Amino acid sequence: MNQKCSLVAIVGPPNAGKSSLLNNWLNKKISIVSSKPHTTRNNVFGSVTKEDTQVVFVDTPGFAKKHGVWGKHLQKSMYESLKDVDTILLVIDSLSPFKLGTEILFDVAKKTDANLLVTVHKTDRPKKSKLYEIGRWLKESKSYEDPIFLTSTNTKTGTEKLLDKIVSLAKEGPWLFDKDQDTNLTKEWIGAEYVREKVFQSIHQEVPFNIAVQPTEWDFNSEKWVLRVRLLVRTLSHKKIIIGKKGFKLQQIGSAARAELMSLWGPGQLFVEVVKDNQFEETIKELYYSS
């Protein structure tokens, strides 16, 4: 069997649905999802293997303005993902399609040698007139004549058709992952990211953007898995918010993450502690983008 392989960068503005598409194709959640922008902080790799063809997706952070440490890292991480990829998949949010990031990413992608595919996502929600408006903008303003894929992970509409197109563009070459390996993330980091997701879903305002997660101890070889995760925060006030009155909020976060991890791995234990990190900026550099 002659192997085929393709490296595909999934790009788009924050909260466009990039992680949802990747999780849909993997049929499991490796890239966390929330309604807040900038949930994805690093490039997350996920691989889908169909017969002789392997597609390795790079789920990138949403395009961010260069404000602060996070903004600079997110933008750098996104641009780095476009180097040496075979295909760029631009995800346009049908509910807010004309963001600055959408246009910038389209222009950047057109300057590369990669194939460019465009999907308008969340198409189960806007009016048809909005979809026509997006198509007109791509054709008239961006001279984009190729087919536009309409997708929704909520209704599973168009996602397989788009995946088939991506697979068809793969060229002959060795696979990058073993057939049974579907991500570059280790189990302990997947678990830690699930905890971070629950913080995003449970805590509002600026707090979720001022935390980092770190797996500290784990055992996946016993009958019941054990994972300890440290939630690092910038300030004592953030720590108090996450812990909540009588520890209720932290218990809620831990219970929600544990329930999802048990559905993924079976019975196990998750322990979460919250720590104020006096070297927070240095820690997040080391954890998320030291490379």
Task: Locate predicted features.
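P-loop NTP-binding site
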Residues: 187-291
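Conserved glycine(s) of the Walker
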Residues: 17, 158, 249
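Conserved, well-folded catalytic cores of nucleic-acid-processing
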Residues: 28, 47, 51, 81, ...
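Conserved C-terminal guanine-recognition region of P-loop GTPase G domains, centered on the G4
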Residues: 49-54, 73-146, 219-224
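Active-site glycine-centered loops adjacent to acidic/histidine catalytic or metal-binding residues
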Residues: 59, 121, 152
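Catalytic P-loop NTPase motifs of RecA-like helicase/translocase cores
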Residues: 40, 64-65, 97-98, 126-127, ...
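Canonical P-loop GTPase G-domain recognition
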Residues: 114-115, 124-186
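Conserved G1/Walker A P-loop phosphate-binding module
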Residues: 1-83, 232
